[in-house]
UniProtKB/Swiss-Prot annotation:
Biological classification of the source: Bacteria, Pseudomonadati, Pseudomonadota, Gammaproteobacteria, Enterobacterales
Keywords associated with the record: Cell inner membrane, Cell membrane, Lipid biosynthesis, Lipid metabolism, Membrane, Phospholipid biosynthesis, Phospholipid metabolism, Repeat, Transferase, Transmembrane, Transmembrane helix
Domain of life where this protein originates: Bacteria
InterPro entries: Cardiolipin_synthase, CL_synthase_A, CLS_N, PLD-like_dom, PLipase_D/transphosphatidylase
Known EC number: 2.7.8.-
Function: Catalyzes the reversible phosphatidyl group transfer from one phosphatidylglycerol molecule to another to form cardiolipin (CL) (diphosphatidylglycerol) and glycerol.
EC primary class: transferase
GO cellular component: plasma membrane
Annotated transmembrane regions: 3-23, 38-58
Gene: clsA
GO MF term list: cardiolipin synthase activity
Protein name stated in the entry: Cardiolipin synthase A
Active site per UniProt: H224, K226, D231, H404, K406, D411
């Protein structure tokens, strides 16, 4: 009997180490950033069983077998649609400014489609203004409305949007609503989904969370886009979820969320429409390719129109696209670079690009909220302050609420606005969308918004930061090790 237990003990030990060795080899064989690999190995060696379970469920990009197959089968029809769209030569920009040229070339090469011109663009900085404008557009919709959001939180003006959407469906407008399962959990537990479906709205719960599927698909892979499309002509995107800040996370102690949205009219709605159709088909298996731009309603020839490129990221889209775009934008800066983000946990490459820009004389400013809703990200973000400050980067901590805007302005000409945070999830994991605008007029509008943020912020003093408490440095470094996983 003693021999039996001895043999079993040795077999368990051997199996235990074999499992660790197998997972270690899998991590090393996967093509990933070195800091990310090291962070996973550290977790597995410190907390072996917990680390292995965490890695198998969260460490690799699993879209799920069914969704991955849909993504594969949809591509031929999507590619044909893109080729057909290229015949509409008059909607594509042939020239870009010097600062935007490299980024637009990158996007066209990687995504197969150039930036589109002739768009009207409005920057919305107030949630009330955004929701009231959206309600008005929904009330005037004639054919179709497509929406995707990470969070839809019932209450306040969000209910006005829901009522307008149901009214549109009742009068015959085809309404589709795609919401992330985790982000919109409160919505899906409310009466609103049933009410909307009864009114004729096609409501879909994206990337449904289930413990039974934890090893089949990454549970932290989320649908993070915020997009509204109306009649293949009007489009919205930006940082704002479908929430009324007065009713959203009031107990978090961070104040009301401050967001930025862009409302567009023009052919960019068509290019955003193909992104939505991909998301819809991956989730439902149903194909809804958008129609080509209507020459009778598109303001192609207006000299005041904006040139816009749309960048989509996430599983099924060009790998590492948004990360490459951000690096290109930063390296294109010659005079000024202003960035706003709620979560500052950049990759090593992006961190070095920002610091290098400051070293070569670019005036670099980063605006982040002083208080955020994640303790882990707050401490991890602080770990990057020292290197940024040493390079001469100005860091502003916004004190007027939780600054949730995601924007970049390069030399007053090149603007990036969308859903992407400067963290690992946005850069390499989630479904995201970013607008790239080559226009100094829009750049001036964005600069005014960023200047308002700075006016409501406190500049981090480099000397005082260097003398912060030692225990704070220890906590920052601890979370820094895990920053590739945040």
């Amino acid at each position: 009997m003693t021999t039996f237990y001895t043999v079993m003990s040795w077999l368990l030990v051997f199996g235990y180490w074999l499992l660790i060795a197998g997972v270690t080899l899998r991590i090393l064989m996967k093509r990933r950033a070195v800091p990310s690999a090291m962070a996973w190995l550290l977790i597995i060696y410190i907390l072996p069983l917990v680390g292995i379970i965490a890695y198998l469920s969260l460490g690799e990009l699993h879209l799920g077998k069914r969704r991955a197959e849909r993504a594969r089968t949809m591509w031929p029809s999507t590619a044909r649609w893109l080729n057909d769209l290229k015949s509409s030569h008059h909607i594509f920009a042939k020239e870009n400014s010097d600062v935007a040229q490299a980024l637009f070339q990158l996007c066209e090469k990687r995504q197969g489609i150039a930036g589109v011109k002739g768009n009207q663009l409005q920057l919305l900085t107030s949630t009330d203004e955004t929701l009231s404008t959206l309600v008005r557009d929904i009330e005037l919709a004639r054919h179709n409305i497509e929406m995707v959001f990470y969070i839809w939180q019932p209450g306040g003006h969000a209910d006005d949007v829901a009522e307008a959407l149901m009214a549109a469906a009742r009068r015959g407008v085809h309404c589709r609503l795609l919401l992330d399962s985790a982000g919109s959990v409160t919505f899906f537990r409310s009466p609103w989904p049933a009410m909307m479906r009864n009114a004729g709205v096609d409501v879909v719960e994206a990337l449904r969370v289930s413990l039974l599927r934890v090893f089949l698909r990454r549970m932290d892979l989320r649908q993070h886009r915020k997009v509204v499309l109306i009649d293949n002509y009007i489009a919205y995107t930006g940082s704002m979820n479908l929430v009324d800040p007065r009713f959203f996370k009031q107990n978090a102690g961070v104040g009301q969320w401050v967001d930025l949205m862009a409302r567009m009219e023009g052919p960019v709605a068509t290019t955003m429409g193909i992104i939505y159709s991909c998301d819809w088909e991956i989730e439902t298996g149903r194909r809804i390719l958008p129609p080509p731009p209507d020459d009778n309603v598109m303001p192609f020839e207006q000299e005041s129109g904006h040139t816009i490129q749309v960048i989509a990221s996430g599983p099924g889209f060009p790998e590492d696209m948004i990360h490459q775009a951000l690096l290109t934008a930063v390296y294109s800066a010659r005079e000024q670079l202003i960035m706003t983000t709620p979560y500052l946990v950049p990759s090593d490459d992006l961190l070095h690009a920002i610091c290098t820009a400051a070293y070569r004389g670019v005036e670099v400013s980063i605006i982040v909220p002083r208080h955020i809703d994640s303790m882990l990200v707050r401490w991890a973000s602080r770990a990057f302050f020292g290197e940024l400050l040493a390079a001469g980067v100005k860091i502003y901590q916004f004190e007027g609420g939780l600054l949730h805007s995601k924007s970049i302005l390069v030399d007053g000409q090149l603007s990036l606005v969308g859903t992407v945070n400067l963290d690992m999830r946005s850069l390499w994991l989630n479904f995201e969308i970013t607008l790239v605008i080559d226009d100094d007029g829009f750049g001036s509008d964005l600069a005014r918004v960023q200047e308002d943020y700075i006016a409501r912020s406190r500049l981090v003093d480099a000397k005082r930061w260097a003398h912060r408490a030692y225990w704070q440095r220890i906590v920052e470094r601890l979370f820094y090790f895990f920053s590739p996983l945040l």
